[in-house]
C-alpha cells in the first residue's frame, strides 16, 4: 500500500479501526487476497439520467466474467449458481437511490439462463423475511447502490443484509460496527454468491437520517462486483472518499466512520479491506476513476 493509499484508508475508516487492519488480521483476513472488478461505461446513463438496460446488462456480464476469469459470461454465471438453486436477489428500494430495475432484471435473466427455474428466483428488499423464495433460498445475490449513511457512514453491501434480522436497530450501535455478524447467521451464512455495489450515481455526502440531495451525487457510471463484501465495499469507500476530497478541496473523512467494513474483515473474516490485498480489475472508462 502506498503512503497515500494508507493515509486515505485511515481517513475513510477512522484511525482506530484502520490501525487494526494494518497490523495482523484476524479470522484469516490478513493473509487473504480478493479480486474486485470495476466496470464503467459512460453510455449506461442517458442525458436524462435514465439507466440504459442493455448497457448495464453488458456491464454486469463483463464484470462477472472477469471476476471468475472466464472469457464469456455464460460459464461464469454457471459457476455462480447451479440449476437446483433457489436464489434470492437482495435489492434496495430506498426511493431516492434504489437498485436500478434494469439491473435487477439483468440479474434475474442471467440466473435463469444459468438454469435456475423462474419460480426459484425472487427479487426483494424489505419483504425478504416473508418471501417464500427467500425462505427456501440456497443462494443469495446482493445488490445495492453506494451512498453515505447517517448510522453506518456508508450504505454498503455489508449493510444490505440487515433486513434479514429480527430487529435491525440491534445492529445500529457504534456506527453499525457488528454488521458482519449477520453474515455468520442464518439465513445469510454461506449463501451469498455475488456482491454488486452500484456506482452509477453514488451519494458522497449527506447530513442526517434519510438525507438526499441530487447535487451531492455524481455520474460515476460504474459497478463494483466481487465474491466477498468487504473488498467491494472498501473499494467503494475509497472512491467516495476521493470524491469528497475533490469536492471539498480537503481530506474530509466520512462521518460517522464506516469502520464496519474493516471490522467485517478482521473480526468476521469477510475479506480484506486493505487495498494492497485487493486485485482491482478495471474495465471500460478510465477517466476520473478516482481509484
Where in the sequence are the language-model features?
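N-terminal and secondary-structure boundary signal
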Residues: 1-291
